[in-house]
């Protein structure tokens, strides 16, 4: 019980630091006049909102019996496994790195899909960029699903900036800010920012390319 409480306190402390870091980056961009005050305010609000939703989803999943705070397996007639595969496969890859097995990984000495779900669905493989990204975070000590998602949330900052810049090509400032707000409130986009998925990273890259 004491170890569990200690683990939760450490996770909470790291989560607070990560949220403050994200807002700190946004404030730095504002101070450097890279973004204006209105965009800084909107971006900070949504970082806070996404962080809160992430934490609520995590504890809801914990209370629903999902040990690691991620939804996976057969639930309400559907099978969920994307977060599961990213989470557990990155853990395996991180262990290989900690054991000094990088050379073996590069040689392909391990199975292409070492993690298999309970429904015999293979993982994404160790060549998957997002799996590698999560494994590196785990390698430096960021292991909880909440903290992994919060780190990933950093991509919302350039997403909001480039969406605003794209909107300003065609719209005035007020309408551009409304565009960013509406986009940020889309249910699907909220999920990509609050679950262990790579979709928000892909959207960010797409906006940068379009700009």
Which stretches of residues belong to each language-model region?
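Transmembrane-helix motifs of polytopic, lipid-linked glycan transferases
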Residues: 24-31, 150-170
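Transmembrane alpha-helices of multi-pass, membrane-embedded glycan-processing enzymes
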Residues: 18, 122-125, 130, 134-142, ...
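Transmembrane-helix signature of polytopic, membrane-embedded enzymes
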Residues: 142, 146, 160-185
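Membrane-embedded helix bundles of polyisoprenyl
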Residues: 176-193, 200-207
